[in-house]
Amino acid sequence: FKYRKRIHSLFHFGEFARIYQSFKNFDKCFKSNSLGTQAVFKFCLDNKIKLIYSATSASLGNKGEDKNLSPYAFTKSKNLELLENLKKWFNFKYEVIYFFNVYGPRHIRSGEMATVIGIFEDQYINNKSLTIVQPGTQTRKFTHIQDTVKVCYEAWLKNKCAHYGISHKKSYSIYQVAK
């Protein structure tokens, strides 16, 4: 194995990633998603590194109108706008991947960053009633981690400056998931 001095690509998936918590931890969300991500963008731009960036399904709802519903969705949407401008201004290379409620082995089952699938799994394993935020009819799309990894790899191979959504075609209500 010979060490390469030039970095070809960078996967940036390390942002603050929860809607509700972004209201409670605005500073943390803003610092991570805006300031931190802009530093990553600049590093990639300065070093001619292709970026593979994780977007969020939270900014896609209601034909894009949901992008201002939370600090999380807002910061992620602004990062996408910046990427598009970097492409125009500097021919910046990237691929954007939209994640939809990823689940699978080792997902977070407790605490503020837990996923809905993880919370339900933890409650089920511990013989607790599943907590459903009423009315329970709100729908979500889900993606298994193996499918997520596969699409991330496939997007990395491309050079299209394109956006890729990863989700099952069908949406499920929280009530259906709990069943």
PLM regions: where:
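Generic alpha-helical secondary structure signal
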Residues: S9, T115-I119, Q176
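Glycine-rich "substrate-gating" loop/helix at the edge of Rossmann-like oxidoreductase active sites
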Residues: L69-Y72, F100-A114, Q134-I145, H168-K170
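N-terminal Rossmann-like NAD(P)+-binding domain of SDR-like oxidoreductases, especially those catalyzing
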Residues: F1-V102, Y124, Q146, W156
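Alpha-helical substrate-binding/gating segment
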Residues: V102, G118-T131, F142-G165, S171
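Aromatic/hydrophobic pocket-lining residues that form π-stacking "cages" and hydrophobic walls in ligand
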Residues: V40, L83, F120, V151, ...
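Short alpha-helical
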Residues: A17, Y172-S173
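PAPS/PAP-binding and catalytic site of the sulfotransferase fold
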Residues: S173-K179
